Structures are given as structure tokens and as C-alpha cells.
Amino acid sequence: MHRILNVLLVIGTLSTAGARAAGAPPAPHLPRPDHVVVVFEENRAYTHIIGNMAAPYINTLANRGALFSRSFGVAHPSQPNYLAFFSGSTQNITDNGCPYRFNGPNLASLLFAAGFTFATYSEDLPAPGFAGCRNLHYERKHNPAVNWQGVNVPASANLPFTHFPDDFSRLPTVSFVVPNQENDMHNGAAPDTILRGDQWLRTKLDAYVRWADTHNSLLIVTWDEDDGSAGNHVATLFVGPMVRQGVYARRIDHYSVLRTLLDLYGLPLLGKSADAATIDYVWNPPAAKAAGPR
């Protein structure tokens, strides 16, 4: 019976997402990373970060990877941006309220249905599967997957950051890293809060970044929203061995990045990601395979 219910859950997930078969091969010009790590920072405009001496590590990453100079959040305040990135919809949420609960398809449910894996690693989460609204400097509004927990996202995918593996080959296919509000640039005034967030990222993830250089792994760093302006201009950057270094001026938003993740893994499209263009212009060509014996 449990097996039948699991099959029905997968069918339901796929039937309410786009029509593409789950796990289909990516387009020939797209890579398929073994791992993607997405780091969410908070409430800073593009001009607050790029070129700012208070963010030396992030600017180093931007210079070695793909920097999107016209990247935008999709709403204010924070929570609808996280929901949009995770599910292709703000779910009609216009505040940072807690708790909310949703039952439609999302990035994690599609990954699981196609045989891939997903986890969120949140700083100050007190225990795996914690569904409370806050703990210390953790806020549920920054952890979108928990809003589907127990529906189509298992509690085992909702983890404290202390569970981020030291053996990076054990990372899930896609993971979200959520610093607490002291370390994601949310709390405090610039430049101190920016410097603190930059230092946290270097301290906690530079070992992964250096490992990813020689492995098929992709880091994405983005901001949920800017400081509340109508423009909502934020920084987004991709870093990894498959990424072609440069500054890219095509307009993107959270739906564009979600669309790209779905396309990398051949997953059905979600909500407004179907109307977004895939980011298909920042990738190194695949390495040519050596010719075999004749």
C-alpha cells in the first residue's frame, strides 16, 4: 500500500507541473552538475555588493565565475522571493508570515520524483525536520521547502547547517544553504553586516568552492531582494568548472534561475519558470572525449 501511495504521489507531482518527462536529458548545450549548492543572502542591492570592499570574497567569486549584472528579485518582502525560487510561484504570499502550508509541486518534489536528491541546510535550525517559525537567528520564512514538509518534501530534507557534509561528494543533487539572519546580511547596518556575511561565506563554504573547481559541482549565490526599492536589483553569480567567466547583462530573475535548474536535470517546468528563459549562455563547452583505438 505504501508503495502504491508513493507512486500516486509522484504521478500527482508530475501531472501538476510542466509536461516534460522527469529526468529527461538536458539540452546538449547545458551541463548536468553532480551537485548544485544555492546560497541565499538577504536584502542587499547589487550596488551594495559588487565592487564593495566590504565583500571581498563575494567579489572574488564574481570575478572568477558568471556575474549577472541585471538580476532581479520578483517581490517584496523576503518570503515570496524564496517561494518563487522554489516553486515557480509566490503562492499569493505578500508578507513574511508563518506558518504557511502548500501542497503543489516544487523543485524538491520534482527532483525526488526523478530519482535525484535535495536538502536545505539552515544555520540555527535546532534539529532535522524542525517546522517552527524561528530559533535563535533562524527564520522559517527563509527556508521555503519546509512549507511543503510532510506533503511532498520529507522532513529528512530539512537539516541544520551542521549537517552540511565534510565529504562534498555526499552532497545532494541540489541543496539550499540558508545562513541565519546575523550572517546573511539581514541584521545590522552596512558595511558591518555585509562584511560579516562575506566572512561567513568564505569561512563556511570556501573549502567546498575549492573542491568544486576540480569536480562537477556548481555554486549559485543570490540575494532574495534588494533593500526594498521598486527596481529590486540584486546580485546573482554562478561559480564552477562548467561556468564561463564573465559579466552577463541579459535580464534574469528568480524564475530564470529556477528554470535553469529544472532544465539542467530535465525536470518539468514549474509555474512562472515556464515563461522565463533558460540561462544557457554561460556554460563552457563540454570537454571533447579522447578518441578510442582504431
Pin down the residues of each PLM region:
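Positively charged n-region of N-terminal signal peptides that target proteins for export
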Residues: 1-4
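N-terminal pro-sequences and low-complexity stem/linker regions of secreted or lumenal proteins
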Residues: 21-294
